[in-house]
Amino acid sequence: VNRKIIGCLVVLLSGIVAYGQKPPLLPEPVVAALAQETSGETAKRNLEYLARHHRMRGSRGFRAAAEHIAGQLRAYGLSDVRIEQFPADGKTMYGTQKARPAWDAEFAELWELRETASGWVPNVRLASWDAMPITLAQDSESADVTAEMVDVGSGTSERDYAGKDVRGKIVLASAQPGAVAQLAVERFGAAGIVSYAQNQPTAWSGDNDNLVRWGHLETFSDKPTFAFMVSLKHARALRERLARGEKIQLRAVVRAGRHPGFYDVVTATIPGADPRLGEEEIAFSCHLDHQRPGSNDNASGCVAILEVARTLSKLIAEGRLARPARTVRFIWPPEIEGTVVLLNARPD
């Protein structure tokens, strides 16, 4: 019996060792060439450029990022480099998805005012588009409003508004602006929203109360409005003052809005060498849109596949790597909706 057990262990361990010594998927010279050529520094330089832009769908910032990616692809020797454009007009249907119009902002500031003998004057700036674009919620519309702030808790249920007059005022809410606007603005007549919505309600939520989360409003709302985003730390201070009965007067100035534009989708290929298999494609895709500041979601992914494209193209051109049998395609769309647009407009 002992001999059988020992024999089984030998077979089992032999299998584990054999599995651990499994040869790599690629020949060692190819792996070495890829490791030598791939550059984290090059990827980081591209990331630094992308992260400078507030890259919302159809915006000037997104277009600048798309042109940078396309320019780099051409410089790296990729084929079929182009920026595909599809209407983002609020009307065109792509399958079951209605295109959202493009959105851009020129200016936005939120100030707390101080009362003086001559009237209310600016005292503390709470948010600035120029300093931090993420403080203006996406799909905000132009406004110039001076109004009192009212705390409405989450702002998503009728009980949040019980006994409170928010008409013509600016509400402070913990939920996303899009979830607050239906009651606060459309039903109860609030002039605008200040939100301190968190990225998610569990896990690390609240660990860093200085963070400002991206916010958004409903694109197709019948009653356009504006919203600013503030940190949890700032919101707590405002809530405490309001709870003590202090009057907080704000002035919000926004120059922003939706307009007909385009979904820009950057694409390029490394053509396959096989006449038959070359018609098939292996796709690398990362969404190019994101807010500024921020580099992880998903500028880091965008520059990662850009560096893959550069590395493969260079090694193939130098004869150090065989051209793949199938075509390799690289795609940089707006997140989700840009992919839906591309697949519906270009089903092939």
Which residues does each predicted region cover?
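Soluble metallo-hydrolase cores and metallopeptidase-like ectodomains found primarily
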Residues: 127-160, 215-296, 307, 314, ...
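Sec/Tat-exported extracytoplasmic proteins
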Residues: 38, 42, 47, 51-61, ...
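Second-shell loop/turn segments in exported
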Residues: 30-37, 51-60, 97-99, 136-140, ...
